[in-house]
UniProtKB/Swiss-Prot annotation:
CDD domains to which the protein is assigned, alphabetical: Ribosomal_L7_L12 (cd00387)
Homology family: Belongs to the bacterial ribosomal protein bL12 family.
Signal peptide (residue range): none
Keywords noted in UniProt: Ribonucleoprotein, Ribosomal protein
Gene3D superfamilies: 3.30.1390.10, Single helix bin
The species this protein was found in: Francisella philomiragia subsp. philomiragia (strain ATCC 25017 / CCUG 19701 / FSC 153 / O#319-036)
BP-aspect Gene Ontology terms: translation
HAMAP family: Ribosomal_bL12 (MF_00368)
Example GO molecular function: mRNA binding
Cellular component GO terms, alphabetical: cytosolic large ribosomal subunit
Name the UniProt record assigns to this protein: Large ribosomal subunit protein bL12
Superkingdom assignment: Bacteria
Pfam families: Ribosomal_L12 (PF00542), Ribosomal_L12_N (PF16320)
Length: 124
């Protein structure tokens, strides 16, 4: 009669925590593996998700001026304080970073302002 997976599971369930730790160490040595590597790999996606959630600074990038370039130039001038020629060059030379490291609220407000002028904007 061979031992089934269910028998092994029941035997492990009856062990103390220290005995289970010793068993894990013995299995690592016997099979040449590390249980810590599997844990680190599983934790990596969670850490990446936390980093994405914690993003507080955004770059506001003008991707396209749209059909009304004059309105886009005015919006860029108002947002950046650039002169007329510099704002015109920026709008015509898209993509152009309008504002770097803006707070979420500031970036959203700026994006809304530029989109109302007909421009296509991305937050990065």
């Amino acid at each position: 009669m061979s031992i089934t997976k269910e028998d092994i599971l029941n035997a492990v369930a009856e062990m103390s925590v220290m005995d289970v730790c010793d068993l894990v160490k013995m299995m690592e040595e016997k099979f040449g593996v590390s249980a810590a590597a599997a844990v680190a790999v599983a934790a990596a996606p969670a850490a990446a998700a936390e980093a994405a959630e914690e993003k507080t600074e955004f770059d506001v990038v003008l991707v396209d001026a749209g059909s009304n370039k004059i309105a886009a130039i005015k919006a860029v001038r108002g947002a950046t304080g650039l002169g007329l020629k510099e704002a015109k060059d920026a709008v015509e030379g898209t993509p152009f970073t309008v504002k770097e490291a803006a707070s979420k609220d500031e970036a959203e407000a700026l994006k809304k302002q530029l989109e109302e002028a007909g421009a296509k904007v991305e937050l990065k």
